């Protein structure tokens, strides 16, 4: 009795059980870090949907004759239609819309309500500035190891118009170029940009968009960008360029007029210098920097521009 050992019933039967028939291959679950979405413009902007612009925002008018402006939603839809028509047979994606500078108001019935008692139905809003990007991903090329998709960008800023007058042709900016898929930087070329597009209705806007698309030469634009990779600068030369860019703003007006315009701000120039050291895609700290990477350092810094100056600086 002293040698008696009581064993669980499961232990006695363990050798007779074929556990393999119930076993499954182990699945290793790895949590992928969520990377923040990259946008073609970032500074002081928020994402907006076309539905929001169409159904939840009011349309500003010219105050002297109460004539409607072409609102942001109509602008986006018109260019979207023009792109789908011109690039028939290609895949044209829906617009990525960014807005800024919200203008708030109230309906007449809520004029005398305290602000803390306002209902959502009492409020009105519209956005002073809007920009959008429409990609055509089936038209693409690789430059410097980066995939570039054809992209159309539109910009509208009510602050650049006089809404206190009678209705006049309205100002729009429209560009077609390529978007770097690594960083969403926009690459704009002179032939693909209209900086002073003035129209009175969406029909004229549609026609102007088709004209811009037709005049743009993507092959020439791509060739010029590919050539950038054939030229490099040393770290010393990069430092000289950054220093001269910083000096530009301090030059007397006469000196500035004798030089090409330089629209980047001091803050953006500082961003270029930081990206030269830290950027995982285009940084070249301690080695030569080719002009394609330098160009992308500049376009990356431009993403911090406000909407109304974004395209001008992209071209510059």
Q: Could you tell me what each predicted segment is?
A:
Residues 1-80, 87-91, 98:
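Feature for intrinsically disordered/low-complexity regulatory segments and propeptides
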Residues 1-35, 113-316:
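Intrinsically disordered, low-complexity regions enriched in serine/threonine
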Residues 81, 85, 251-254:
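A generic structural signal for well-ordered alpha-helical segments enriched in polar/charged residues
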Residues 85-124, 129-131:
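A short acidic/basic microdomain associated with nuclease active sites
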């Amino acid at each position: 009795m002293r040698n008696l050992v009581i064993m669980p019933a499961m232990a006695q039967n363990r050798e007779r059980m074929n556990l393999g028939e119930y076993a499954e291959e182990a699945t290793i679950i790895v949590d992928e870090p969520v990377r923040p979405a990259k946008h073609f413009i970032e500074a002081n902007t928020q994402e907006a949907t076309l539905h929001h612009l169409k159904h939840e925002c009011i349309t500003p008018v010219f105050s002297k004759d109460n004539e409607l402006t072409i609102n942001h939603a109509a602008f986006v839809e018109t260019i979207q239609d023009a792109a789908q028509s011109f690039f028939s047979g290609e895949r044209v994606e829906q617009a990525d819309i960014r807005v800024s500078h919200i203008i708030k108001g109230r309906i007449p019935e809520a004029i005398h309500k305290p602000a803390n008692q306002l209902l959502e139905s009492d409020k009105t809003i519209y956005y002073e500035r809007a920009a959008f990007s429409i990609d055509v991903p089936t038209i693409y090329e690789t430059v410097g190891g980066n995939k570039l998709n054809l992209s159309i960008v539109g910009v509208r800023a009510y602050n650049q118009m006089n809404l206190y007058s009678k209705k006049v042709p309205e100002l729009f900016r429209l560009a077609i170029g390529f978007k770097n898929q690594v960083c969403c930087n926009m690459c704009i070329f002179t032939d693909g940009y209209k900086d002073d597009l003035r129209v009175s209705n969406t029909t004229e806007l549609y026609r102007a968009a088709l004209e811009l698309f037709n005049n743009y030469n993507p092959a020439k634009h791509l060739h010029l960008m590919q050539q950038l990779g054939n030229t490099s600068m040393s770290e010393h030369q990069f430092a000289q360029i950054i220093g001269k860019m910083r000096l530009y703003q301090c030059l007397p007006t006469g000196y500035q007029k004798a030089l090409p315009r330089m629209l980047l701000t001091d803050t953006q120039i500082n961003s270029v210098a930081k990206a030269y050291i830290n950027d995982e895609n285009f940084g070249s700290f301690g080695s030569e920097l080719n002009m394609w990477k330098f160009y992308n350092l500049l376009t990356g810094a431009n993403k911090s521009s406000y909407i109304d100056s974004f395209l001008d600086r992209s071209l510059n």
